[in-house]
Amino acid sequence: MSIARRTTLSKFLIEQQRETNNLPADLRLLIEVVARACKAISYNVSKGALGDALGTAGSENVQGEVQKKLDILSNEILLDANEWGGNLAAMASEEMETFFPIPANYPRGEYLLVFDPLDGSSNIDVNVSIGTIFSVLRCPHGKQATEESFLQPGTEQVAAGYAVYGPQSVFVLTTGNGVNCFTLDREVGSWVLTQSNMQIPADTREYAINASNARHWYEPVQRYVSELNAGKEGPRGDNFNMRWIASMVADVHRILNRGGIFMYPADKRTPDRPGKLRLMYEANPMSFIVEQAGGAATTGTQRIMEVQPTGLHQRVPVFLGSKNEVERVTAYHNEGK
């Protein structure tokens, strides 16, 4: 692909704005700012030990998880990049207990930005792919945000995306009109369109789950996974392979490219906490992307994007990816009701 014929993220968004007339200028600018922040995070991740950013920060986030230095740095990069542009009323991050209103000395906009600044950060020190996940909502109260402003079901998202920082850095985006992937060209510093209208195959022979928790799963998940593991001799009559990176962005990106089902179910260890993944920061944006690519995403009993949030850090079980497999494991859950 010659440099002259490349489509950068900025060009892509401008063309989409002209062609569809459903991408407001403020939203386009917001997405570009988020993408620039992801580029800065990618740069810091790539420095590794040379940048003195590896290791823990000696603190915990609101989830009770030990924060890595890069967790904190990535969070600061996203806040600093987005607070002054006039596109947002407020932001919320997995790393912060409460939401972040845009300071009074900056202009405010009509959007809300929700993000997991560095997903899969347990993999930082071992050089495995990690990433950033984000979601954009309209602020229902104009430019004055409260915590209630964020508590909208995923169906209200106007944009969602993620970046993967791996062998290449990629930026995957949907604004409700399909899913497109951009690769960071480090020589010119631009996100360049490399995959258009990505589609997840409806059928798959790959699944992603942390099998070390099998003894804690509820019966529908145990049944589903045992059938996959039984292979060609079992009830499915086919052989399946397990893939698990322990980095949601990396697992979902693989599924987006070649199919599969990603599962992070609730389990018996914490019956009062339905799942581990956060609805607002992880499940909703990934569900929007997966559905736009022809896949499906449920909690096992309900479409994820129809869940009414009750708190910024609410957790849900997650089953997403190839449509036929998600429908099967969801049916197993509903049989047990």
Curated annotation (Swiss-Prot):
Q: Which reaction does this chain catalyze?
A: beta-D-fructose 1,6-bisphosphate + H2O = beta-D-fructose 6-phosphate + phosphate
Q: Where does Mg(2+) 2 bind?
A: 116, 119, 282
Tell me, what is one Gene Ontology molecular-function annotation carried by this entry? magnesium ion binding
Q: How is the cofactor bound?
A: Binds 2 magnesium ions per subunit.
User: What's the chief localization of this chain?
Assistant: cytoplasm
Keyword Magnesium listed? The answer is yes
Q: Which enzyme type, at the first EC level?
A: hydrolase
Kindly give the PANTHER family that the UniProt entry links to this protein: FRUCTOSE-1,6-BISPHOSPHATASE-RELATED (PTHR11556), SEDOHEPTULOSE-1,7-BISPHOSPHATASE, CHLOROPLASTIC (PTHR11556:SF35)
Q: What's the subunit arrangement here?
A: Homotetramer.
Q: Which NCBIfam families match?
A: PRK09293.1-1, PRK09293.1-3, PRK09293.1-4
Name of the protein: Fructose-1,6-bisphosphatase class 1
Q: Which organism is it from?
A: Burkholderia vietnamiensis (strain G4 / LMG 22486)
What would be the name of the gene that encodes this protein? fbp
